[in-house]
């Protein structure tokens, strides 16, 4: 009867639409025989949909049989815009409320359309109730990016991992809707609609994807703010060997999803092998260094300004190993520290190990114990592996499900291929006392001191050239970006694994960079001012007359 063709103008970057551009396109309708049409409209819609399931183990109790497992669904409409293409405004206004259809002759009808820029905030906020479960505060909610656009291709029953992953989605569509005239028959009481729909990829600008950490979660999980004296004391005590720790952790199964209910404490497993003592409190593995001001506010050491939730991202953070490694003398331990200012925000094509990248360019091996016994040991770094851990959480009707997967960035790379490179990257001798403890360490016992050795991965011939997500990788149908919205949050962590040869045994250290925000955009240049080219004086010409004599 009719054929609808919907074409969108390509985005500026040729890949996805952003918040700074308008979505436009062209509609062509081929009508083969006369038809009654009431209206033709073009719509832009966006919605968030989550579906969560209760683990069957949670349905059992001692007094009753298992109840039927119910799915919990939540749908949030975040944007809806509509433009009428037919009839034109002057005709529509002249109808004065009449809903009679128009008899349209066969032929080709074409229309152009253009929507305004995407709003900054979703429309569902106006319908949020006070007790609505949400991962973000009302005043911090922004438009989310497209997520799981290709969910139909991934939600196959033969791949259970992707099936659970696609239970949360953010979809944006452009849709043509043709409302046909009402038929004059009792058995056809409703109007008929014809539709043509296209999915679009929408990713807001990086500044609109930045989410604010929950202050309570930030303090409880990610950092400790301490004065110099408190910092020294905490460094001396926080990673002490805990031989009485009987807590067991589940290993992370790479590329495997786990479903957990909201009331279950979700913890990622840590590597545990012989000779390794796992810290009972992993919350102390990160330390945000700074000074306490007169009003109990954190003061930046370099800029002497109050630090809020935004500029905390630029503070010097120490990411300690998840566990300490016991050395062969059984009285000394060692751990690894990643000291960084820039791992909170990581953009595509950022250098990871290069000097000045503020990522993994400042790494130290810290040892505590008898220095004389340490010098008798052979401690060498052998292999490095860097993983990106993805955590997606969906919530619906008070039930939350979690999915965990892993993406390998650097795979089991040898740290040192020859003696010359080994000397540049790691020298166990000489060993030095940490600079921040050198003048304040009150314990003169040489058998119970802390020492550090720099692991110069920034000088590695391969690592110093590695950029994050240089190829714009698509993981499970989505680019690499973090975001939080009403019922979906997608978070990332870096996991740094280094194998150490201690005498004749291999031990592994693990550093988790928690709550890093990942962006698929390339970092914008900062402090670059567009200026006119330097003025150059134009050349001067002199006129010379040539005369001829008769």
Swiss-Prot record:
Region annotated Disordered, chain positions: 275-303
Location(s), subcellular: Cytoplasm
InterPro entries: Arrestin-like_C, Arrestin-like_N
Role played: May regulate endocytosis by recruiting RSP5 ubiquitin ligase activity to specific plasma membrane proteins in response to extracellular stimuli.
Cellular-component GO terms for this entry: cytoplasm
Main location: cytoplasm
Keywords, ordered alphabetically: Cytoplasm, Endocytosis
Keyword set includes Cytoplasm: yes
GO BP term, example: endocytosis
Protein name: Arrestin-related trafficking adapter 10
